Amino acid sequence: MTKITRDVSITTENSKSTSGSATASSASLPENDHPIFHQPRARIRSGSLFIEGSDSFPSSEVKSYNVYIDDSKYSEILKGDTNSSSTDGKQVFEDARDDNFHQESHRDLEDSILDLVRRDPEVAAFPLPPPNSNERNRNSSNGSSAETNLNGHSSSGTISTSVLLNMGSAEKHAGTTRGDHMESSSMKSFEKLGTRPSSLFYPPPEGTAPYQGPRATVSGNKSTRQTQGTYSFPSMRYGVDLVSPVEGAVDVAKSRVPNSTLNGTFPDKAFIPHEFQIPKKAWNRIPANKSTSLKTPRNHSLLIDILKPFEAADLANDQRSSSAVLKNTVHSNGQYNPTNETSGTRMQDQRQKNTNEIDLEKIPNPQVPLGIAMDTMRSPNQLHEKEYESNIEAGLASGVGKGDNSIKQHQYKKIPQEIDRDQQLSFQMETMPIQRIDSSSIRSFDSRIYGFSEIYSIPRVITTLCICLFVPPLFFFFSINGNNGVSNYRLMRMIMNYEHRIGLLKGFEWDIDVQWFRTLCFVLGCIEMLAIFASIGIGFGVGIIRE
């Protein structure tokens, strides 16, 4: 009798297989927990292949449901399977299903098994199991054969619940899974009888013929799967056999999808990126007709018009006439001749070379008026420097223009050095960002040209001196520069005009000399001190005389 156990809290499903099919497993408990059956109940259905029972554990409220398979009925099914040669394994299993549950559809069988496992135990009389049932269960879980109990039931193997559920879940695997399951069950039954069926994993014993039954096709399918290295189980498939169903599904999906969409999605031609409409360089473009383009005549230089207006005018007229003649020839002939264009270009180049070889001494300098105007605004030293630079440039120009060797080698070495020195001086004097007041009356000694009042405020100077007369030490205080006296910045703000005073910024270097005011304050202070001491001496002398 095969026992099927379903535990609510703990379900042990050991799928240890040696033949490659779903094998029997038994639910075993630890050694410390001895199952005690209190009023076991069973329900026996007449003519049924399965017998259910219930076990209760007093230590906890956990209940165990057991389903037994009648070995006698199952042996009869197997005998009928071996005797009948016209029916296959699927038909035998359908007949057993009809005899057990009297149902007509395969779906009803699955629902009945689920209901059988999950229902509550009913009240029924069930005899107590023998005391060595726990040891027998442990032996059966370890793989040893168990003896038959008092009721004729044996727990030689426990079929996992998942096997029963998966056995009826997919009809497409009915031929393979049912055959494997029935073959695994038949192995246990034949072990009890002392005989062994022949299969791929169990070779026939000596002196016996191999098993030939109606399930030859099922065994053939199973052998092909085993040779491919797969594990035949309806819910778990490992090995190479897993690829074929996936590929088959992909092929079916592709057959359902129209071929037009697939062809449109994956074109056969190579991928061409977008070509952006960027203007390409002229030399990258290769014209279809490789003909030289018409070159326009070169424009004459404006410098030539300034230097020699008469020759420039003649040259411009010649260029206009040559271009007009060239245009007329092109329009009249209807085609372009490159020899005429090249000859005209050569003539223009020759004329320009001739005009460039004019003696530089005869050419007037167009920048002379501008240079004179700039020189008048600068100091005499700058005028001298400008004249020196112009002489150097004239010497270089004359030497290069004439093409003679009048200038010696040491002069060539000396002239660049002088030019570099002059450029450095001009950079230091003109380009330094120093805040200045560009005026001819910037210094105090420029008062002789009546520019003193443009910078300094005369009323403010007189007011400052009057205050110092009433307080004589202020003369000496203003005459000292530095931390002990008054800084140049504060002194300039005291005596300068309003227009210059608002532009003063602290921290900048001003080119204004206020030393004259400091000297004036020192002299006036000394005079005042002498006058004070003289008046004091005169007072003491007059008093002594009167006494």
UniProtKB/Swiss-Prot annotation:
Record membrane topology: Multi-pass membrane protein
Keywords: Cell cycle, Cell membrane, Glycoprotein, Membrane, Phosphoprotein, Transmembrane, Transmembrane helix
Record field: compositional bias (Basic and acidic residues): 348-358
Tree of life domain: Eukaryota
The keyword Phosphoprotein is annotated on this UniProt entry: yes
Extracellular side, ranges: 1-460, 543-547
Name of the protein: Bud site selection protein 9
Natural source organism: Saccharomyces cerevisiae (strain ATCC 204508 / S288c) (Baker's yeast)
Designated gene of the protein: BUD9
